Amino acid sequence: MAPPDSTHGGSFRDHLKTNDRSSTSKGKQRYSPLQEAIPEEISSFRSPSEYADTDSDSDLERSGSYKLRPVDRYGSHHSSAFIPVIREENGVETYLDSITEAEQELLSASKQYDLVDDDDSSDFDSDEEATLRYRLKDRLKRRRARLQAWQPVKYARIWWRTLLAVVVTLVVVVWGFLSFAVSHREEPTVWPMVPSDSWFPSPKGGTLKHWEESYKKAQSLVRNMTLVEKVNITTGIGWQMGLCVGNTGPADIVKFPSLCLQDGPQGLRFADHVSAFPAGITTGSTWNRELMRERGVAMGREARLKGVNVLLGPSMGPLGMMPAGGRNWEGFGSDPVLQAVAAAETIRGIQSNGVMATAKHFVMNEQEHFRQPFEWGIPTALSSNVGDRALHEVFAWPFAESIRADVASVMCSYQMVNNSHACENSKLLNGILKDELGFQGFVQSDWLAQRSGINSALGGLDMSMPGDGLHWVDGKSLWGSELTRAVLNTSVPVERLNDMVTRIVAAWYHLGQDTWERPPPEGNGGPNFSSWTNDEVGWLHTGSNDGSYARVNHYVDAQGTGPEAHSIIARKVAAEGTVLLKNVDRTLPLSRNASSPSGGILRVGIYGDDAGPALGPNACPDRGCNQGTLATGWGSGTVEFPYLVSPIEALESAWSTEIESTAYLRNAVMPADAVDKDLCLVFVNADSGEGYISAGGIHGDRNDLFLQKGGDTLVRTVSSNCGGGQGKTVVVIHAVGPVVMESWIDLPGVHAVLLANLPGQESGNALVDVLFGEVDASGRLPYTIGKSLEDYGPGAQVLYEPNAPVPQVDFLDALYIDYRHFDRHNITPRFEFGFGLSYTTFELLDLSISPLQQKSRSVPPRPADAVAPPVYDISLPDPASALFPAGFQPVFKYIYPYLSNLDGTAPHNYSFYPKGYNETQRPSPAGGGAGGHPALYEEMVSVKLQVSNTGDRKGQEVVQVYVSFPPDFPERVLRNFTKIELEPSERREVQMTLSRKDLSYWSTREQNWVMPEGKFQIWVGRSSRDLPLMGEY
């Protein structure tokens, strides 16, 4: 989501030249968002004002005494007095070529208008005509002289144009040859980009057995609701019109409360006395299912204590197709299975507290550039174009697992998918999410991602957030009273509204929120904090001027205490999410009793802005700046830090013996600053975030994958000079995603590298735990670290410049995300997906592959609905019942469901339905259960092996299972994993299973999951390229 920005606005700037755009690193030119000043256009043509200053003719202007009069060229016998004057001269064509653009416009205008003297409307007299002829002849001579001076330039242009034509011809010939060669080469897989299909009507919820009781309760409540109450529940009341970032209206008659929706995936945004947990990318790096769930439990507990009904997380989109994507850090990694497992465990943890979780952003929200039109001054958001197979096997996979985890809400994303806005894309919401995946909860929009009223309702959207329509805080909603009117005039069927509100109420019952204390005035429930002020007393409707206020902050401490303190789980996740990438001669772990190699006091240098606290963790709104140690990215997915333990603070008390420590908390250091040190600790980072904030020249998405703020230079300088070349340098990276480190990773002075990701509030403590070996280095990469951004392939590049009025991003190779692309093209990465060193060693052995079921090509026929969905009376109420009640005083900009008049409420034959609205849709054969057909999740294969700790200390190993399909598939794909802890010499059996879906692909022809014929190779190992064990099935 994004907050309103007063600088948003403008129009599509497709007329900007390449050299007009803001610059980025490596000399590239980039498109700038509207938050920053837009440079003036540099044009090869001058403006009219410039013509007036340099090329205007005072006789032609006559001090503005001439005006233009329309001429009927068919009925008038008067010709322009100006035209014969020109045509009587010699060299007319040369003259016309040389005159300025303004004069050409005047000549063109003269063909349609007569020049008339305001002082005398009669024709020119002979003296005036002669004078004008003389002056024009003189001007023509000067023009010819000027033209002769430009002859060399003219010939030079001709030469260059000829050369360009030859080059273009050669390129076309070569391209044609290559195209012919490619077209005659065997290409087993083709990914056609087709517009999004339609899928109507929106499937009704309440068809799965484990939701039956919740839907029965919801049906009883909804039956007693009025039309305006139903609309009130589906529409937010407006940005800053309640205490939370999102607030629905209540249904007072049936005692259904207003719901509080609050960010986000890292904890509670805009709240006091809450925890700043490690980011999703750090959590994914743990590869620890138990920690993933425990973190979710703690997040859900804090949301419950603060009175939040719906927590807007976890994030599983973006998936990380683009390694420079600005919000990748909110998710768990660049693989659908890793992302799915972490998301599902987080959801189970959050919802164990009765708080509704939100799976977001559905789907293909892979970059920040052009995700919203008003952020970039373009007509509409970009379109992410993806094939059906990649959509199912990659991007929708985590959402399917989230639905299996019983997630209550799904948030649709900002951008378009196959040129249909995600929040009204009926194929996505109706066809895939609700029908095929059996989603029983409600679909909410991202904040202002709703782009239509009727189409979004029919397309499957159930809740509009924050209620505002196309603009922030204007009090004009696409739903609210407009939805009331649309239902009354039958353009939106009342059955659709009934399903929308029933889904929301059923989710409320499903999480047991009907047992929560009611909010004021009936009780003391509801949110006990304000998103808009830290003061105890504040406005109830901050976005309005109504002046109503109350106690809004009760300062409830939700962080837990003692052994239940959430700082404990935050520290564990941050430590286990730290990845050891390099460790020469067992430089790590450090000894707390260390001394200098010469036997004296250990001399330690600490380098880099990232080591220190700088201005504090909350110095910039939504963490929108890179200063001090980096513990989170920026945007709506972050939180207010209760505290932040920086590395420099934690290191002050890390050694048991006396040491000599010197801190250089800056990125510009001199070689002399390192020459007398035994140990050099270098802290560097790379930041990014949501697109509504620009910081350090980064407009959401990173410009490249290099370290920021001179980090690469800092590492090279320190490592080359530490101890006069004899010292040991340890590099600690805090980053939102992969960083290219080719300029220093192989330097002999770099002895160890730790990737600490985004560790949250316990940053320094968790780092010290790993540095000194209190915790094993057990993190594993949740993405591939390539040697360059180009290694990830053309399909993984952020679109930084709009390539059309509606920017188009074609995910042609989306099936080959991250390590799959590296494997497909045999590219050697710097560090592969799943890689990570440990302080001990492990051995994997005795692999056993056992079939649990016989292979079969496809799933059985789709099972019938287990339960019939609710049925309601569909008669419409008296439109007058939807009017504002007599004497009602509306709050300015607050969004109500009431009508101010009855215009447009009469039923009529609405004829502007989306394409395909009247076509009957066949239920997906891949549906029938939560997450899809129940048979997809049957266990097909058992994988057993022995894991032995062959080192001299306790440690944790991540055992990863990959599957190689028969030909025409990615080389291998992750399908399962587990993490175990072993004492030295301990040996233990590990067992995992593979489901039918794990061994199937999505058939675009059959629109179903199909298990291919042939043998599967099942690989087991420590990373995507360290797979010592292999069996077949």
UniProtKB/Swiss-Prot annotation:
PANTHER family: BETA-GLUCOSIDASE, BETA-GLUCOSIDASE E-RELATED. Glycans are attached at N224, N232, N418, N489, N528, N593, N909, N918, N976. Pathway: Glycan metabolism; cellulose degradation. One of its GO terms (molecular function) is beta-glucosidase activity. It comes from the Eukaryota. The active site is at D446. It comes from Aspergillus fumigatus (strain ATCC MYA-4609 / CBS 101355 / FGSC A1100 / Af293). GO terms for cellular component: plasma membrane. Beta-glucosidases are one of a number of cellulolytic enzymes involved in the degradation of cellulosic biomass. Catalyzes the last step releasing glucose from the inhibitory cellobiose. Residues 183-1033 are extracellular. This is Probable beta-glucosidase E. It holds the Pfam family Glyco_hydro_3_C. It is an enzyme of class 3 (hydrolase).
